[in-house]
């Protein structure tokens, strides 16, 4: 098993980092570059940037801040937001991103996953999945979650989409558990465990981190490859060096700070 990854997530809106609860009521958390530099210095393994307004607004990510980040940090980072065609992905990678992530565009055009994998290699292609548990107990996919007014409920079951995304060429899956997002009550171990059983590529957990034990639990119980979090890092509730030390004490292999 490779070292487990600790991944701060930076939701971007109008050139600023924001954070909401269950994908709503976003508040400003700071400057993109300042936060990226802080996480680089504190030992993050990689960063994920989501331009949360891009897909709902029908536009692509702003390449200017991607270039600014790439010039200043030396850790891998992934960019998501409005990447609906190969040339847009090419521009994001050319601006300096190491990986691109697609979510709503992949739902609208599943063949995009294959096209991106063929153009850039599966190692560059991440599929993000926003998932919520419905009244019948099934987890299903949501689309356009960056704007609550445009969010769409789909009949597609989350676990079915995980299988299909891999078949099409996804090199990594980030599972955003919407019921847990921003509430700091722990990752959705039940959902992530079922996803793990079907996921042959790296799986990253997202949504629910509130304390260090939550990270240990998701690594031990769901066997994910990485844990993504936002509010606990942005607020300073958890420091990455302290978290990595805690995880080592729990016999979880992580990279040095």
Swiss-Prot record:
Catalytic activity: 5-[(5-phospho-1-deoxy-D-ribulos-1-ylimino)methylamino]-1-(5-phospho-beta-D-ribosyl)imidazole-4-carboxamide + L-glutamine = D-erythro-1-(imidazol-4-yl)glycerol 3-phosphate + 5-amino-1-(5-phospho-beta-D-ribosyl)imidazole-4-carboxamide + L-glutamate + H(+)
Name assigned to this protein: Imidazole glycerol phosphate synthase subunit HisF
Job description of the protein: IGPS catalyzes the conversion of PRFAR and glutamine to IGP, AICAR and glutamate. The HisF subunit catalyzes the cyclization activity that produces IGP and AICAR from PRFAR using the ammonia provided by the HisH subunit.
Active site: 11, 130
GO molecular function list: imidazoleglycerol-phosphate synthase activity; lyase activity
Highest taxon of source: Bacteria
Family, as annotated: Belongs to the HisA/HisF family.
CDD domains reported for this sequence: HisF
Encoding gene (name): hisF
Any single Pfam family the record assigns to this protein: His_biosynth
Keywords: Amino-acid biosynthesis, Cytoplasm, Histidine biosynthesis, Lyase
Entry's localization field: Cytoplasm
Cellular component terms (Gene Ontology): cytoplasm
Quaternary context: Heterodimer of HisH and HisF.
Coiled coil (residue ranges): none
Enzyme class: lyase
Pathway listed: Amino-acid biosynthesis; L-histidine biosynthesis; L-histidine from 5-phospho-alpha-D-ribose 1-diphosphate: step 5/9
Organism field: Xylella fastidiosa (strain Temecula1 / ATCC 700964)
SUPFAM superfamilies registered for this protein in UniProt: Ribulose-phoshate binding barrel
EC numbers, comma separated: 4.3.2.10
GO biological process, one term: L-histidine biosynthetic process
